[in-house]
């Protein structure tokens, strides 16, 4: 029993759970429906716990999924509220019950379907969460490409499966203190990055575009890389841009990105190129803006951001989020 409702295992009412999962997926923008459908898969294979939140005497119901991490707390992956009069207090009630049952909620999705973002934002900020918004962008197919810089001592070559260890090492240095690792599968930075790189190189969920996935060198030293993929919608996508922190700010990231865009333009001349970044990534945002990437409108949103607990963030080594830090890093 919670402050305003009851959280029960989905097995108590499987038919209602299935209906809500279907309604949840249909409520999302078309580009995000795969994220909604993933909930059913994760529930069936036991990857997430799933519950129904009901309020006695009320038609309101919420579908919620989460994962508990011993010694760390709870992460909420999905939330869908089906209510004639949705209230953000329903969210605070659910988080309170989950915190009591599984441990403090240190992270939750920002895709809180059925709730007003304008009402949820001040509530979560007051509860001590910081919003990490994803900015989905495209480089339009008809837009002229800036020239690849000829200054600098960088060289590039196509990435090969044998580069796995090199990519993991660059990633671990580049992602040290990265806040949204709290949304990654295992919360083990090296393990999660190793799994991601291995899956990308093996052509896992999305096809890797080898001709536009490049490794950058300063002399013989690998200093950065970009992975480009071809999602199911057929539009090329810059999936990962990583530069060793020791070489950041020297122009290698810009040169590498422009070289990749040049390769993608040659391979897919009539298609836009997608790229997503976290709004707090000020340096990345400046680079992508200067190159010519343009934000997509909200209704074409393709990725899901997060709300992360300040208490969890300040425990991350080298995290840029400190007590008193503003929501957008200011």
Per-range role (PLM):
Residues 1, 70, 82-154, 158-160, ...:
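Acyl-donor-binding surface of acyltransferase catalytic domains
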Residues 1-20, 155-182:
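A short beta-loop-alpha structural element at the N-terminal edge
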Residues 25-52, 182, 186-213, 217-218:
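Active-site rim helix/loop that mediates acceptor-substrate recognition in acyltransferases
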Residues 36-98, 102, 218, 226-236:
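Conserved donor-binding loop and adjoining core beta-sheet/short helix segment
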Residues 85-100, 243, 249-263, 286-290:
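Conserved acetyl-CoA-binding loop-helix of GNAT-fold acetyltransferases
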Residues 107-119, 245, 274-285, 302-306, ...:
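Conserved beta-strand-loop-alpha-helix junction that forms the acyl-donor binding cleft
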Residues 113-133, 254, 279-297:
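Conserved active-site alpha-helix within GNAT-family acetyltransferase domains
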């Amino acid at each position: 029993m919670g402050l305003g409702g009851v959280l029960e295992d989905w097995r108590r009412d499987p038919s209602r759970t299935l209906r809500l999962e279907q309604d949840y997926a249909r409520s999302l923008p078309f580009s995000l429906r795969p994220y909604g459908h993933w909930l059913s898969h994760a529930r069936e294979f036991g990857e997430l716990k799933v519950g129904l939140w009901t309020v006695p005497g009320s038609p309101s119901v919420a579908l919620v999924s989460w994962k508990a991490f011993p010694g760390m707390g709870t992460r909420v992956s999905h939330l869908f509220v089906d209510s004639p009069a949705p209230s953000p207090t329903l969210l605070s009630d659910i988080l309170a019950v989950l915190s009591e049952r599984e441990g403090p909620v240190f992270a939750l999705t920002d895709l809180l379907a059925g709730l007003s973002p304008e009402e949820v934002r001040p509530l979560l900020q007051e509860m001590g969460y910081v919003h990490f918004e994803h900015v989905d962008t495209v480089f339009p197919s008809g837009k002229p490409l800036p020239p690849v810089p000829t200054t600098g001592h960088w060289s590039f070559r196509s990435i090969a499966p044998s580069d796995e260890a090199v990519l993991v090492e660059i990633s671990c240095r580049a992602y040290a203190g990265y806040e949204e690792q709290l949304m990654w599968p295992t919360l083990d930075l090296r393990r999660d990055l190793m799994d991601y790189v291995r899956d990308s190189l093996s052509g896992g969920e999305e096809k890797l575009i080898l001709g536009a996935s490049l490794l950058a060198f300063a002399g013989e030293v690998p200093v950065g890389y970009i992975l480009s993929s071809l999602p199911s919608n057929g539009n090329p996508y810059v999936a990962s841009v990583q530069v060793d922190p020791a070489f950041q700010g020297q122009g290698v990231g810009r040169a590498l990105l422009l070289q990749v865009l040049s390769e993608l333009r040659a391979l897919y001349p009539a298609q836009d190129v997608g790229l997503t970044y976290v709004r707090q990534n000020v340096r990345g945002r400046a680079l992508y803006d200067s190159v010519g990437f343009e934000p997509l409108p909200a209704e074409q949103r393709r990725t899901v951001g997060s709300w992360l607990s300040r208490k969890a963030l300040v425990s991350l080594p080298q995290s840029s989020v400190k007590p008193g830090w503003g929501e957008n890093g200011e």
